[in-house]
């Protein structure tokens, strides 16, 4: 959060790389695995395990890990699915969600929260969604219809800042 602040927030670089990657693979068949440069495989046959999981799983737009490290997290981070995840880039409905919700809502939210990364936007939308207002709250309506498309998985563990042993996985 201490880098240069632009109109796109402190994390403009990583956010733009993510959306650029989503654009680059949008017309390719299948799923896409997005892996940032600070991530490494930690078990044999990791890619095969991910592929086998996708073959048997109910279709999801995003499959990834909740934060499993020891550090305290704020409200927009506590349940977010880490960006190092599998994305249903072949699904036109997912691409529509990226184009009409994810990217534009990030652009809106970074004005007030310049530290917001792309992978915390969904959690931020949950924070804004007020189910007590039901259909009078567009964020609640949106998340009520899209929530089942976001899945937690232990296949790509988010252990940032952790002293966790690989045997714990």
Give the role of each language-model region.
Residues 11-14, 39-43:
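Short capping loops/turns at secondary-structure boundaries
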Residues 16-20, 45-53:
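Alpha-helical elements of Rossmann-like donor-binding domains used by nucleotide-donor carbohydrate transfer enzymes
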Residues 1-30:
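Active-site-proximal specificity loops/subdomain of glycosyltransferases
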Residues 24-30, 52-60:
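Secondary-structure boundary elements
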């Amino acid at each position: 959060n201490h880098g240069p602040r632009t109109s796109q927030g402190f994390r403009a670089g990583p956010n733009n790389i993510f959306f650029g990657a989503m654009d680059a693979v949008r017309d390719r068949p299948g799923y896409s695995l997005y892996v940032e440069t600070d991530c490494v495989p930690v078990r044999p046959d990791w890619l095969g395990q991910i592929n086998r999981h996708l073959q048997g799983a109910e279709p999801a737009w995003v499959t990834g890990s909740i934060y499993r490290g020891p550090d305290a997290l704020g409200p927009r981070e506590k349940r977010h699915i880490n960006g190092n995840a599998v994305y249903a880039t072949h699904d036109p409905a997912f691409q529509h969600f990226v184009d009409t919700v994810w990217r534009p809502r990030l652009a809106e939210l970074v004005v007030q929260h310049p530290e917001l990364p792309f992978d915390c936007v969904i959690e931020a939308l949950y924070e804004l969604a007020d189910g007590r207002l039901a259909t009078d709250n567009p964020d609640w309506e949106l998340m009520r219809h899209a929530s089942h498309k976001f899945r937690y998985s232990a296949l790509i563990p988010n252990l940032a800042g952790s002293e966790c042993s690989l045997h714990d996985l």
